[in-house]
């Protein structure tokens, strides 16, 4: 609480002090841009340069004010990719937040979030998402511009990482700005492609590429990365390796309805990574904040010296973990599961303990050694509040507690991709699903217990297993599901009735005003239409 008060008083100073740093290899004489040949020469003369550029890519994921800082705004929900995950989760039906002033992620109001202007608080969110992804893409292009793909030499692994991360960004963007990949959408406008080889004039007048064009590049980049990262040993889980590349391609294949390929890639990623799911016992305590856990394949590694941690409150732990007593969750801006989904979870499923019940109880709070965490949450408990996410340091309530890693890929997700891919390609997806849940979550589980077909059962498992981790919106779009909040009693009244049928234009995010003004290839007529709820 004291940190929140402190930051309100220094927010304007922080905004004035914010600067964006471009990598040295992008700067040429008199501020000009170096050519690809010049960058390649620089990299060969200074091998540390490519490593620095790679680090810059991953740093962009966790940069303070990355989305809005260049536009002159300093928002407490602008702390990198984890913030995007929270925004998109709030658009669905399972991730509930209170409708209060301290809730920086209360964007469950459909009409507000579809605002793309710079003159409203809600309109800033469209800019935040867009800018964050394209800044990461720009950092990736710093590598791809300077390396010959046909003859990358010692820069092969750097190139492959850049291509994989770029593909990740475009895959995320594609699921925000157009309906899912299908024969009906292939020629529909998606997002502008920014990549190596483009002239300044092409970038300044860059129209929306089609869905087909965007996914063609995603697939080409991931194919190259999957092959080129063979044998690469990364320094830590913050870097993309071959396992991550196969996992990303599994995600892309799932969206593209390449079911068998998705299952195959997911299985390959699991084999390469050696990652295994958390056990029932391990799931029985708060977590999902430590990249060293054996189920984690890729993560944003966050340490105490990172700017987002030094703020105390402008980080995902402050907004998500119920156990951090000096962040926004300590003033009731907590995250809950929808009561309807919670009630569907069996009492024998360890994941039911990831949220408080209607009596404010969870077996996770009684886990050995967690008495301090139980005390931390008691002042602001709400029914169905999450206790899934721990902090960076479960023994601390200070700065170390805010340094939680953000998990980008874990074994459980890949198993669910494998199950879905097999189920939709004639394989034994049900067997894979049953084995996972019975072994690692609920020994009493049966695939038929929710009365759903196998495809919807896998989606149900994803909704529970991956709750809060940034997958919900992509699943709603690719599976063409309605957003239905009617079966829950804990949605704030203002948002509870905001159900949306699949296929409506209101599901599409709108290209931000600043992009339309800066990009000669896009005008307001090219934007996704605004649709009233």
Question: Where do the PLM segments sit?
Answer:
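Conserved, well-structured interaction surfaces
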Residues: 101-177, 209-212, 226-232, 399-406, ...
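Membrane-proximal, proline-rich intrinsically disordered regions
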Residues: 21-86, 327, 332-335, 341-347, ...
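Sec-dependent bacterial lipoprotein signal peptides
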Residues: 1-19
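Flexible, polar/acidic helix-loop-strand segments at domain edges
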Residues: 345-409
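Short, surface-exposed recognition loops and adjoining beta-strand edges that mediate ligand/DNA contacts
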Residues: 31-41, 76-84, 177-187, 191, ...
């Amino acid at each position: 609480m004291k940190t929140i008060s402190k930051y309100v008083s220094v927010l304007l100073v922080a905004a004035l002090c914010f600067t964006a740093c471009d990598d040295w290899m992008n700067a040429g004489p008199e501020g000009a841009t170096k050519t690809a040949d010049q960058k390649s020469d620089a990299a060969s003369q200074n091998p540390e340069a490519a490593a620095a550029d790679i680090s810059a890519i991953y740093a962009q994921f966790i940069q303070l004010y990355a989305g809005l800082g260049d536009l002159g705004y300093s928002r407490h929900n602008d702390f990198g990719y984890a913030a995007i995950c929270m925004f998109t989760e709030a658009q669905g039906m399972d991730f509930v937040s209170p409708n209060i002033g301290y809730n920086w992620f209360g964007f469950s109001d459909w009409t507000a979030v579809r605002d793309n202007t710079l003159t409203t608080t809600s309109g800033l969110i469209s800019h935040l998402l867009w800018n964050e992804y394209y800044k990461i893409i720009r950092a990736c292009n710093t590598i791809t511009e300077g390396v010959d793909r046909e003859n990358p030499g010692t820069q092969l692994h750097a190139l492959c990482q850049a291509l994989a991360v770029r593909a990740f960004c475009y895959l995320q963007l594609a699921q925000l700005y157009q309906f899912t990949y299908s024969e009906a959408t292939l020629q529909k406008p998606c997002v502008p492609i920014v990549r190596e080889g483009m002239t300044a004039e092409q970038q300044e007048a860059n129209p929306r590429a089609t869905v087909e064009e965007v996914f063609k590049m995603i697939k080409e980049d991931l194919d190259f990365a999957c092959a080129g990262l063979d044998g690469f040993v990364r320094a830590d889980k913050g870097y993309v390796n071959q396992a991550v590349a196969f996992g990303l391609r599994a995600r892309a294949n799932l969206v593209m309805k390449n079911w068998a390929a998705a299952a195959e890639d997911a299985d390959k990623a699991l084999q390469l990574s050696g990652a295994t799911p958390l056990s029932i016992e391990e799931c029985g305590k708060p977590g999902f904040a430590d990249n060293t856990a054996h189920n984690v394949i890729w993560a944003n590694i966050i340490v105490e010296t990172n700017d987002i941690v030094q703020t105390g409150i402008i980080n995902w732990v402050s907004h998500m973990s119920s156990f951090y007593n000096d962040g926004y969750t300590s003033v009731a801006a907590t995250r809950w599961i929808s009561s309807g989904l919670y009630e569907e979870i069996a009492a024998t499923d360890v994941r039911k303990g990831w949220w408080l019940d209607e009596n404010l109880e969870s077996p996770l709070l009684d886990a050995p050694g967690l008495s301090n965490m139980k005390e931390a949450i008691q002042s602001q408990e709400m029914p169905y509040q999450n206790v899934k996410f721990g902090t960076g340091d479960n023994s601390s309530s200070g700065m170390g507690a805010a340094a939680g890693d953000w998990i980008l890929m874990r074994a459980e997700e890949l198993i669910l991709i494998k199950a879905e891919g097999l189920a939709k390609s004639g394989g034994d997806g049900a067997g894979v699903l049953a084995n996972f849940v019975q072994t690692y979550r609920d020994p009493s589980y049966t695939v038929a217990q929710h009365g759903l077909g196998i495809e919807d059962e896998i989606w149900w498992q994803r909704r529970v297993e991956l709750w809060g981790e940034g997958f919900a919106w992509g699943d709603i779009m690719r599976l063409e599901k309605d957003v239905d909040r009617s079966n829950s009693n804990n949605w704030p009244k203002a948002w509870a009735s905001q159900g949306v049928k699949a296929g409506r234009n209101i599901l599409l995010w709108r290209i931000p005003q600043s992009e339309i003004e800066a990009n000669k290839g896009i005008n307001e007529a090219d934007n996704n239409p605004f649709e009233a709820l």
